[in-house]
């Protein structure tokens, strides 16, 4: 399989169950080990060995299963939002919860996320609002892919 995505394009993978959509996305994100092939971003070949390396390279993944792979349901919306963005909100091991909440508020407005407060448990949100929180945390990262 080969494909190219240009800056600003929205790219989706479609297919029947078992066709390899999820596996392909997980390979690109570094969640599964790649046996062959290459991933190139901005002309540079990436050798991703983990999701952490993928995130650092500007790659994110909106999972199919937000409940088990996209959110920590027992944690607050703010905490879920902050997880992939700790490098932006933490300093010397302390999280600046005010900055984290302010950044979240921007996305809550833009995506029209319905919640009572940033400290509301992610598990109590509707499915659509949970998915918006997953999207918000990656939008905050300004991911490339």
Language-model features: where?
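Glycine-rich phosphate-binding loops of nucleotide-dependent enzymes
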Residues: 1-145
